[in-house]
Amino acid sequence: MRVSLAASLFAGIALSLGASVSLCSAQINGSTINGHRIIVPDSSIPRPGRIHTNYFIVDSGARNNDAPPPDAETPASLACVYKLVKGTKGCPIATSKNVPTGGVGAIAIVDAGDYPTAKQDLHTFSSQFGIPDGDFQIVYADGHKPPVYSNWEVEEALDIEWAHAMAPKAKLFLVESKLCTSNKCNTDPTWQAVKVAGELVAKNGGGVVSMSFGDAEWAQERQFDHYMTTPGVVYFAASGDGGIGFTIHPGASPNVVAVGGTFFNRDSNGDFINEQYYTGGGGGGISLYEPRPSYQDVIKKIVGSKRGIPDVASDFCCAAIYLQGWGEVGGTSWSSPTFAGIVSAAGQLKKSSKDELTMIYKEYANKQQHKAYFNDITQGDSRCKVGWDVCAGVGSPKTYAGK
């Protein structure tokens, strides 16, 4: 069957290639990548007072959706580039086969809305890449199944498939929340889901929580930071897709590891060349309201008195996903669950986000460790410098060491 990528991903959802799609100029570098149109779903467009996801879709036009897109990164190709597995020269997408096999404790993904085909899609994705099914459970944050929200199933598929791909031995929870759809919510229901996610992870041996959503920073955001402090849990959050200078919460919270976005440059043969900042995409900057945490004292000359994000980064574009058909998706929505899974697979779980971040910045302060444990991202924007920067933090993962 020949269908468009967007149509396959949005089957049953009120968005098609013929619709008028708003593109956020700050979210992406233009409206195409590798010659393909970028589609920013409604749920990924920032609006005041509304949480949004951080992903976009690559429209490959009419193509067969019964196999992964040939230019979409796979678990094996990404793991090869980041030296998480024994790889082949060039880490080509087509021939990289070795996938991560680790994972400890639990991983909880926080998303909005029900995803009816989650288990089937996760199984299909895993089978395609030689990944065992593992232990997967869907939890309703308030005890009741939420409605299906337009476009959020793509986010949920991306999150669970890639967290599981990086750490298949970890128990995986998908915590589904309702959304606040009016101005009458005292507290967005998503925060209850974050609380539930932390409790689930803590009860299952500790681990990580990944959040691929956010909202533009606002003056009262600090009152919600306590939701990311459950003992035994490290929280990861997307830094946003608004480019440098656009910071979001919870990504700006000092209680999360903020994950920014990069891009793999490949040659005409599909071999990896280098990694750069995803220009105009990965969110980063200095928080408007969060004070600089002590673990960032090592970069105080850069960030001043406020929190700087991201802390780390991972590939931003683009990932193979399965949602009743294969597609290609990008954004820091991919970066966050990927990095969370890598930390789980590293097997040295910390007792809190602060402990994880303290370790990361201590390693950054040690030039030898920083070079050994992270890829310093210095290309893609004039603000990408040697060392920590608002492009990619301390860098992207290099092996499991120091994670």
Question: What does each model-found stretch correspond to?
Answer:
Residues 8-20:
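Bacterial N-terminal signal peptides
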